[in-house]
């Protein structure tokens, strides 16, 4: 009761309490608080005030706060014990847990994939800066599971000290080291086996190591390379390759060469290459036409003769189709236009129809005015609704009256034509003589009663007749001369009618096709379980689909992949992208977006590459890379061992006088006589006699020296690498799976503008650095030996088959055994063994393939696997010793540079000292610490526990 009275009195004395904020009143009340004992009622006021946390937080809460204490909202948890919370900043923003963990429901949008790597930062932050655990605690170790719960690293391996804690105290040092080595080997084997089991059913993993799928994929890639090689040789022979230089100033010429290769790879002809000379058309802009009343249109073939009369004759376009038509497109949609009937018949009919339609429109307008006036006078809802319905009907009739009349006449004419053609086929004579007589009579009869539709049939497209004429001349020897002077036959007329649509396709194929220009869609998220066939099944429903490419998965993306879907240029790519975004594959959104065209296809490299000395070095490197890649994919038949000499022995053979084996023997045309350009020449004697040393050149530098002959040789090698092997030499990289990407031969790096002068030191440094960057192409991939794979846990096929037989042999009772594969019972295990090898041979073959599958994975020195846990690597003594306070401290910063909201530098106290913790005192080195001095009585007895 006393508390209530005191509170009431204090509120009554507060004169301006309605004009002040809660925080201001709180501070004033805090100032008026007497310094009494803890039993005072006013000392407990802060506990009841939700905006006061000084006393409850612990640690001398006398300071005023200008914001609420967020620690009061934590609920019943451990409170901070140190420091003054008066000036504390709010805690860092709580990160969401990982989507793949079991305690939280995964996000259905990404199917368990963490695209922003928030879990890595969350684990790191919670282990160091959490208010609920001290900084000296070890970070939580996340175990690796299957593909769904796969972590970003392997679990932490025990160090030697931790391993010793699990062993007996009386164990010897040699025994400890032996057991620890076995532990590390078993740990590595276990991780490889777990990774294999987690990913063996995924398509990308099968394409790499499965004994059947990997061979099929390798043959497919080799077929792509063979096709590229044929195209390059063709362009090399016709002079296209030799007419261009790999310089950035010749960007247009380089792009033309690359586009020529793409058109050839797509199956284009020399006629299609003319599309490169045409100005690229603007990207069509699509608009959706909204028209009511679905009405079917009758399409007729437009005659090329009538193109000049197209504007004069009325064109009937169906208003019902909600089709998507591109704007600013002339001939791309020429076959979608509806042709008009011949001018002779249409000239008279529209006049009569127009006059009738004008009379109708006048009557309708007058009736409309009357209805408007009557609608103003009357106020009934029925009259207004009926008038609105009449207006809608009149609008529709007004719009479609003329078209309906013409459409009905066209249908009648089409039926007449069909009946006449059927009559001609039925009355076809047996002998050629009778055929000529009967057909002549039919022509005369048809001239007497000729309809407008028959005139349109007589005026067939000229191009279609020219295409079919040679074939028809060979098949039909007898011709008929009509009154108009044209030669025709019955079979010719029938063939023209039957192959009318095919002829239109031939007409369109005669135009150059821009096969190098495509439209594409980028898929951001593809689960590892999604196969290429599933994506193709979704995309084949859209017209213009060409191919799909799927990238290899990345460990930092939780083995999610990216994809590119390629379509022809004339499709509405945005509509397809919208449709793909509304679909899900295996409960995973693909994240489809439109892929833009390449902005800069020719990009400049360092201009020092044009120097003669650098060019000679580049020729040597290019030749080595070409030899290595050609041998890897077996593009050219290998020459005999006597004919091929490596680079290092080429000089020795020439010095011994063996000129027959001089150089490198290869059937690759770009490597013919390549060794002649690898031998460096210099005027050493002349420079020595004239006293021209290289000291001045090193100090001042020398101008860039270009050798056009060497550059021409290098350009052939660079273009061969780019076109055939998809290796961009001046960017020291390879563009993988380029044959399935939207842009084949898309980007190339060329020599940029050369500097004025260059020193020899710069040249040597550049050559050395560039060779190190190209080591991935220079070194041959060697598989691991059997002994090395055995150490990694390689399996034996017969041993695994025996394990399979034992696992499927179950003893039910005495002399009663069961085979789980078939459910049959046998008297002994030997009968089950015989039964498995006879009746379940495919299961045994699967076991053998599984063993080969696993061993292929182990033999790859660049096999994919989870990276080692940071705690498994050796750490410096400063972190693991006395100064760290913990066995392992993860890196201070997250993988990205930005820190979460609310993060302050005061919270970065050496990986410890988070919220409400005092800053950790750094210990000084031993020589800077104050030496403790002990005082003792000389008369006292000796004490071993005194200071020095």
From Swiss-Prot:
Location(s), subcellular: Nucleus
The organism's taxonomic lineage, starting at the top: Eukaryota, Metazoa, Ecdysozoa, Arthropoda, Hexapoda
Subunit structure: Interacts with cbp20, Dcr-2 and pasha.
Family affiliation: Belongs to the ARS2 family.
Basic and acidic residues composition-biased segments: 8-34, 41-50, 95-106, 274-312, 342-361, 394-447, 458-497
Chain positions covered by the region annotation Disordered: 1-106, 274-497, 856-893
UniProt keywords, alphabetically: Nucleus, Phosphoprotein, RNA-mediated gene silencing
Domain of life of the native organism: Eukaryota
Pfam family, one: SERRATE_Ars2_N
Organism of provenance: Drosophila ananassae (Fruit fly)
Function of the protein: Acts as a mediator between the cap-binding complex (CBC) and RNA-mediated gene silencing (RNAi). Involved in innate immunity via the short interfering RNAs (siRNAs) processing machinery by restricting the viral RNA production. Also involved microRNA (miRNA)-mediated silencing by contributing to the stability and delivery of primary miRNA transcripts to the primary miRNA processing complex containing drosha and pasha.
Name listed for the protein in its UniProt record: Serrate RNA effector molecule homolog
Gene name of the encoded protein: Ars2
């Amino acid at each position: 009761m006393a508390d209530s009275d005191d509170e009431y009195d204090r509120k009554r004395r507060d004169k301006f309490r309605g004009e002040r904020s809660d925080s201001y009143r709180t501070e004033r009340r805090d100032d008026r608080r007497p310094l009494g004992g803890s039993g005072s009622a006013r000392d407990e006021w802060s506990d009841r005030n939700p905006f006061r946390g000084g006393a409850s937080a612990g640690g001398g809460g006398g300071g005023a706060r200008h914001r609420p204490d967020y620690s009061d909202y934590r609920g019943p948890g451990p409170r901070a014990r140190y420091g003054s919370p008066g000036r504390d900043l709010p805690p860092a923003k709580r990160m969401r847990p990982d989507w793949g963990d079991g305690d939280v429901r995964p996000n259905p949008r990404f199917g368990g994939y963490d695209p922003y790597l928030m879990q890595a930062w969350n684990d790191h932050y919670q282990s160091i800066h959490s208010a609920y655990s001290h900084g000296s605690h070890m970070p939580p170790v996340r175990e690796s599971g299957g593909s769904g719960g796969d972590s970003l690293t392997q679990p932490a391996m025990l160090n030697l000290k931790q391993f010793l804690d699990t062993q007996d105290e009386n164990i010897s040092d040699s025994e400890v080291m032996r057991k620890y080595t076995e532990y590390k080997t078993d740990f590595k084997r276990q991780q490889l086996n777990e990774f294999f089991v987690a990913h063996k059913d995924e398509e990308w993993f099968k394409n790499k190591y499965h004994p059947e799928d990997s061979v099929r994929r390798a043959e497919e890639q080799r077929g792509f390379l063979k096709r590229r090689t044929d195209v390059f040789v063709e362009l090399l022979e016709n002079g296209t390759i030799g007419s261009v230089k790999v310089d950035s100033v010749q960007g247009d010429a380089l792009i033309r060469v690359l586009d020529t290769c793409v058109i050839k790879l797509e199956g284009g002809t020399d006629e299609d290459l003319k599309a490169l000379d045409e100005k690229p058309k603007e990207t069509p802009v699509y608009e959706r036409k909204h028209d009511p009343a679905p009405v079917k249109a009758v399409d007729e073939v437009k005659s090329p003769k009538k193109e000049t009369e197209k504007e004069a004759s009325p064109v009937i376009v169906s208003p019902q189709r909600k089709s998507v038509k591109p704007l600013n497109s002339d001939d791309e949609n020429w076959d979608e236009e509806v042709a008009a009937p011949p001018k002779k018949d249409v000239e008279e009919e529209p006049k009569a129809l127009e006059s009738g339609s004008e009379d109708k429109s006048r009557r309708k307008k007058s009736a409309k005015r009357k209805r408007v006036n009557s609608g103003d006078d009357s106020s009934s809802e029925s009259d207004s609704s009926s008038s609105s319905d009449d207006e809608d009907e009149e609008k529709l009739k007004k719009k479609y009256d003329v078209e309906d009349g013409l459409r009905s006449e066209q249908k009648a004419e089409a039926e007449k034509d069909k009946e006449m053609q059927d009559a001609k086929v039925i009355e076809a004579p047996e002998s050629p003589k009778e055929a000529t007589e009967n057909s002549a009579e039919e022509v005369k009869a048809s001239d007497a009663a000729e309809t407008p539709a028959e005139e349109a049939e007589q005026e067939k497209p000229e191009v279609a007749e020219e295409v079919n004429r040679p074939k028809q001349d060979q098949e039909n020897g007898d011709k008929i001369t009509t009154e108009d002077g044209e030669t025709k036959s019955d079979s010719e007329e029938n063939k023209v009618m039957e192959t009318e649509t095919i002829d239109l396709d031939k007409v369109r194929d005669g135009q150059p096709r821009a096969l190098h220009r495509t439209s594409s869609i980028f898929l951001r998220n593809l689960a590892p379980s999604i196969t290429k066939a599933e994506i193709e099944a979704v995309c084949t429903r859209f017209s213009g689909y060409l191919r799909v490419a799927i990238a290899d998965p990345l460990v930092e993306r939780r083995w999610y992949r990216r994809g590119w879907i390629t379509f022809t240029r004339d499709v509405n790519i945005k509509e397809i992208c919208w449709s793909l975004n509304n679909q899900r594959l295996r409960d995973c959104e693909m994240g489809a977006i439109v892929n833009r065209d390449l902005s800069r296809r020719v990009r400049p490299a360092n201009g020092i590459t044009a120097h003669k000395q650098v060019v000679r070095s580049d020729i040597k490197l290019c030749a080595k890379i070409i030899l290595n890649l050609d041998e890897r994919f077996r593009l050219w038949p290998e020459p005999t061992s006597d004919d091929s000499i490596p680079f290092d022995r080429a000089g020795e053979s020439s010095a011994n006088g063996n000129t027959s084996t001089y150089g490198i023997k290869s059937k690759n045309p770009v490597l013919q006589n390549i060794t002649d350009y690898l031998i460096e020449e210099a005027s050493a004697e002349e420079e020595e006699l004239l006293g021209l040393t290289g000291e001045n050149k090193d100090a001042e530098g020398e101008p860039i020296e270009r050798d056009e002959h060497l550059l021409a040789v290098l350009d052939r090698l660079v273009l061969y690498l780019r076109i055939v092997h998809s290796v961009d030499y001046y960017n020291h990289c390879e563009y993988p799976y380029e044959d399935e990407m939207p842009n084949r031969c898309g980007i190339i790096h060329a020599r940029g503008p050369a500097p004025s002068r260059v020193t020899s030191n710069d040249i040597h440094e550049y050559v050395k650095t560039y060779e190190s960057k190209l080591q991935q192409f220079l070194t041959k991939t060697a598989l691991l030996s059997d002994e090395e794979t055995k150490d990694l846990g390689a399996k034996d096929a017969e041993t695994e088959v025996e394990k399979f037989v034992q696992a499927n042999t179950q003893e039910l009772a005495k002399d009663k055994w069961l085979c789980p594969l078939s459910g049959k019972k046998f008297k002994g295990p030997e009968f089950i063994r015989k039964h498995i090898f006879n009746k379940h041979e495919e299961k045994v073959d699967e076991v053998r393939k599984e063993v080969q599958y696993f061993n292929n994975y182990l033999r790859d020195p660049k096999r994919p696997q989870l990276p080692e846990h940071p705690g498994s690597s050796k750490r410096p003594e400063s972190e693991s010793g006395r100064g760290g306070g913990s066995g392992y401290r993860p890196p201070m910063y997250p993988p990205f540079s930005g820190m979460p909201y609310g993060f302050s530098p005061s919270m970065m106290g050496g990986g410890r000292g988070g919220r409400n913790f005092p800053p950790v005192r750094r210990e000084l080195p031993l020589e800077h610490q104050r030496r403790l001095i002990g005082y003792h009585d000389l008369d006292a007895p000796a004490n071993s526990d005194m200071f020095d």
